[in-house]
Amino acid sequence: FCRIVAGQIPATVVAESVNSLAFRDIEPGAPTHVLVVPRRHVPDLAGLAAASAAELADAVALAAQVADDEGLPGYRVVANTGEAAGQSVFHAHLHVLGGRSLTWPPG
């Protein structure tokens, strides 16, 4: 994701803030599936929380903005932290999922 933030890899950016970038997932798990990433590299959500509560709050606020911009009546925000939780890209990120009924538990 560092290369996307740097503009070296194309992405469909839907929103941004000073500290975060939001772009569409290339393998969406829902009709709306957007990733919100911090602009600086932090490997996972726990690392982001430890490094900067303000940057974590910024990412969560941008996720809410994305949901509003997309007109989602309901949405889910997911952060997989660690390989055992399904994290496959080790740059902290939030998944914003919506556009259909989401069941629980997710998987």
Which residues does each PLM region occupy?
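HIT superfamily nucleotide-processing domains
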Residues: F1-G107
